[in-house]
Amino acid sequence: MLRPAPKVDLHSGLSHSISTDSLAASATAALEGEYIEPIFVDSNREIDDIVRNMLPHFEGRETEHNWIPREKSMETLRKLVRGNAPQAYSQHFLVGIKSLLDGILKVVNSLRTTLSTAGCLFLQEIAKICGPGIDNMVEMLLQNLIKLCAGMKKISAQNGNATVDAIIQNVTYVPRILQHLSFACQDKNVQPRLFAAGWLKTLLNKQARHKSSIEHGGGLDIVEKCIKRCLGDPNPGVRESMRGTFWTFNQIWPDRGEE
């Protein structure tokens, strides 16, 4: 059932920004700025019913017949995550989202800009609201989203960038996240390398009070290699972005920064 609720700003968490063209900015802003009325549920069964009704829409490839139901499903999920389900029925809600994850990623990778954007915004919202609750989805999410960042469509790449940033900022840090950033720093496409500097800065700021989590297991060496690699990147934008990340690194580990 639907009940009105105060508007909550879920889009203020980016620790860095990359300039976009006006089309990309306006397309994303149109969806970010809309008011989404939350769905409030009264039982686990309601969540089950919502998820079960969506599953058929995500089967197979995107077609002229299923893209609109997929878009409506994303609208429903964005309403659901803003309601009481993530708090009152957390475990059941997250199990339901996990069962829909393949379909959600199909939406994220859609060539239809508004559909893909809706998928990315949902992932940003669930990362900010559920945080560590989506830890078991992070590997699959980062694999897909970093690949999205390498695509030719600038709007989709920018959405992927913002979504990766939101995930890194809100989930539990594990060394595998740093591995993904290292791979992005070496990507043959310039956009993941450009974005990786911002993602790394977000990660460093997040873990600044828990430095040992990065220091253990060789993580600090990986960070240094990422910084050195991008500071020597042939693309000036990548070099410039990583300079800001270096100064963040230098504040946290001044002895290593001076080397």
Each model region followed by its residue ranges:
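Fungal intrinsically disordered, low-complexity polar regions
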Residues: 1-62, 259
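Alpha-helical solenoid cores of large eukaryotic proteins
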Residues: 3-9, 21, 57, 76, ...
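Helix-loop junctions that connect tandem helical modules in alpha-solenoid scaffolds
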Residues: 4, 15-17, 56-66, 103-112, ...
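HEAT-repeat alpha-solenoid elements in large eukaryotic scaffold proteins
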Residues: 20-34, 63-90, 98-101, 108-124, ...
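Core helices of alpha-solenoid repeat scaffolds
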Residues: 32, 44-58, 89-104, 123, ...
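Hydrophobic residues within the alpha-helices of tandem HEAT/HEAT-like
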Residues: 77-82, 104, 118-130, 141-149, ...
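Alpha-helix boundary/capping and short turn/kink residues
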Residues: 113, 131-135, 154, 190, ...
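Conserved tryptophan-centered aromatic signature that marks the ligand-binding surface of SH3
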Residues: 235-241
